[in-house]
């Protein structure tokens, strides 16, 4: 009985660990389409510092600043990952 309970517990832990790891590996997307209604020079970005790394390996202060650069570059700059580069 103890072996069955231990095995069940082990399987449960392995299942939840593998599920959360798979979820964290899914690529995050940044939706820049909400900024297209503004002229690129007048996008109202918040001053909140939540750094993101762009595909040009430049750290942007937040997703809005990344989207501004992405729109300026016609989509060449994309989201790479959260945090500093």
From Swiss-Prot:
Subcellular localization, as worded in the UniProt entry: Secreted
Its source organism is Homo sapiens
Record-linked SUPFAM superfamilies: Kazal-type serine protease inhibitors
PANTHER family assigned to the protein according to its UniProt record, in alphabetical order: SERINE PROTEASE INHIBITOR KAZAL-TYPE 7, SERINE PROTEASE INHIBITOR KAZAL-TYPE 7 SPINK7
Q: What is this protein called?
A: Serine protease inhibitor Kazal-type 7
Top-level lineage group: Eukaryota
> Domain named Kazal-like: which ranges?
26-85
Intrachain S-S bonds: 32-67, 45-64, 53-85
So what does this one do?
Probable serine protease inhibitor.
GO BP of this protein: inflammatory response; negative regulation of cytokine production involved in inflammatory response
User: What are the entry keywords?
Assistant: Disulfide bond, Protease inhibitor, Secreted, Serine protease inhibitor, Signal
Per the UniProt record, the site (Reactive bond) maps to: 47-48
Subcellular location, principal? secreted
Q: Which SMART domains match?
A: KAZAL
Magnesium recorded as keyword: no
Q: Which Gene3D superfamilies match?
A: 3.30.60.30
CDD domains xrefs? KAZAL_PSTI
InterPro entries tied to this protein: Kazal-type_SerProtInhib, Kazal_dom, Kazal_dom_sf
Q: Which GO terms describe its molecular function?
A: serine-type endopeptidase inhibitor activity
The signal sequence is: 1-19
User: Gene Ontology terms, cellular component aspect?
Assistant: extracellular space
Pfam families per UniProt:
Kazal_1
């Amino acid at each position: 009985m103890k072996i069955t309970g231990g095995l069940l517990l082990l399987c449960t832990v392995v299942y939840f660990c593998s599920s959360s790891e798979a979820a964290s590996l899914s690529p995050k997307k940044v939706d820049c389409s909400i900024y297209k209604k503004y002229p690129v020079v007048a996008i109202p970005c918040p001053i909140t510092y939540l750094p993101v790394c762009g595909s040009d390996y430049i750290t942007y202060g937040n997703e809005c600043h990344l989207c501004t650069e992405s729109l300026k570059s016609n989509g060449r700059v994309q989201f790479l990952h959260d945090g500093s580069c």
